[in-house]
Each structure stands twice: as structure tokens, then as C-alpha cells.
Amino acid sequence: MKVTGSTNITVRKLIRNLEKSKKPLWRKVAEELSIPSRKRPYINLYKINEHTKPNDIVVVPGKVLGIGKLDHEVTVIALDFSKSAIEKIRASGGQAMSIYKALETFKDFKGRSVRLMKQ
């Protein structure tokens, strides 16, 4: 069976842009997005809450779901968010940002604690 990659055109363009950035973090995210969508991670907020400290940046190469709550401020960068996840992230004082926007906003993460969460 031939491996074709993502069939979603916007995800394919995003993968290309991430690979062009030449930053190790964005290249790893591009590699994670290249897997089939059924194998992409779905991360709940309680997992993000467990594994982060205040003012951390979390990158999720999949979808963030709204189960659980955040008790500290976190910037979450993901391919997709559920509505409840966005509301809870903002209620805790954090920021929910798409990978598209983060690629333009964050040129480098010097001095910031960044975590790539897959499961």
C-alpha cells in the first residue's frame, strides 16, 4: 500500500512551511503531522495541567480536548481545539493558538520552556 501523507491540503501546506523553517521543534511537529489523522494525538487539558508549569508553551500536533481544567497560565499551540478547551484555556489566563499563527508569531523560543505533547 502506498503511503500518501495527509489528504488535507491546508495540513500539507502547513507541513511544507514547518519543514522550511529549519528549526528543530517545527521540523519535529511537521514529522508528527505527517502521520495519518487517525493516529494524531488527542490531548485533554488535565494532561497539559499535569505536565506543565506556569507560563510554559505546549505544542500539540493534533487536537486539544476540554476534559479537565487548567489551574495555571499556559500557551497551547495545536492543530485544532474543541470549543470547551479554548474557553477553559482562556479562563485560566492562557492562550490558545493554532500552529499556523504560532509559526508566524514565534520565530524562536529562546528562554521559554516548550513541551511537545504527543500522548
Curated annotation (Swiss-Prot):
Keyword terms of this UniProt record: Ribonucleoprotein, Ribosomal protein
A GO CC annotation given for this chain: ribonucleoprotein complex
InterPro entries in the cross-refs: Ribosomal_eL18/eL18-A/B/_CS, Ribosomal_eL18_arc, Ribosomal_uL15/eL18, Ribosomal_uL15/eL18_sf, Ribosomal_uL15_CS
Domain of life: Archaea
Gene3D superfamilies xrefs: 3.100.10.10
One Pfam family here: Ribosomal_L27A
Residues in the signal sequence: none
Listed GO biological process terms: translation
GO molecular function, a single term: structural constituent of ribosome
Family: Belongs to the eukaryotic ribosomal protein eL18 family.
The protein, known as: Large ribosomal subunit protein eL18
Species this protein is from: Saccharolobus solfataricus (strain ATCC 35092 / DSM 1617 / JCM 11322 / P2)
